From Swiss-Prot:
Pathway: Amino-acid biosynthesis; L-lysine biosynthesis via DAP pathway; DL-2,6-diaminopimelate from LL-2,6-diaminopimelate: step 1/1. The lineage of its organism: Bacteria, Pseudomonadati, Pseudomonadota, Alphaproteobacteria, Rickettsiales. Its main location: cytoplasm. Keywords: Amino-acid biosynthesis, Cytoplasm, Isomerase, Lysine biosynthesis. This is Diaminopimelate epimerase. It catalyses: (2S,6S)-2,6-diaminopimelate = meso-2,6-diaminopimelate.
Amino acid sequence: MSSQSPKRMYGTGNNFVIIDSRSINNLNWNYREIANQNGCDQIIVITNSSAADCFMHIYNADGGEVEMCGNAARCVGYLIMSEKSTEYATIELVNKRILECFKVGGRSIKVNMGKPLFKWHEIPLSAKCDPLHLPIELEMLKDPVAVNIGNPHMVFFVDNISEIPLQSLGPKLEKHTLFPKKVNVNIAQVEKSGEISLRVWERGTGITASCGSAACAALIASVLRGYLITRQTSVNLPGGKLLIEWPDNIFMTGDIGFL
């Protein structure tokens, strides 16, 4: 992987521009302009790390840096593993988490996303309340679950995700006063098969075809609410399918590719 040679990649419907800046550790890029020119969900900048194989900076289309992106981690993990000719790589994030990436076959990459956080101040919320039943209601959406997967999420459960006007409700919910750092908004439907169908309004980006941490949040919320007994299922997003497992840490597996 050559330094500063941008690559366009995707992870289950999420599109990224990935810049390797390890040779000079340069973060001075116009992220909004890059996003507008390339039509990507996020810009990923790889720099050096003393604690892992690399440090991954994640910038949304609005130019703001965020803490976590599981789908981007799978793409970066693949690049690092290809560079090292190994099947394992580690990635440091701005929130100090170290993600472990594993090659499980072809371009299918598994990521250990770490332990989810559930306490109200860990998510974080601006006021003490029960994260399993947030006092939030907007039109047909109510009673969401909040969880932190390295970034804040709230999950609403509905009978039919296609009926939810996410384009109009997403911006309002993202900026809800209960979330001082804003929040990723997830609309989940637990299917009879035990799989989860999911739509996502991503903080700082908007409606997105996929979001790995959102898929993790959806499984966790489904288990905590008692909608699922198993801690492993497939989450179906507009951009494709992710396998999510929650034995203790949360794991996500899916395909990556180049654009």
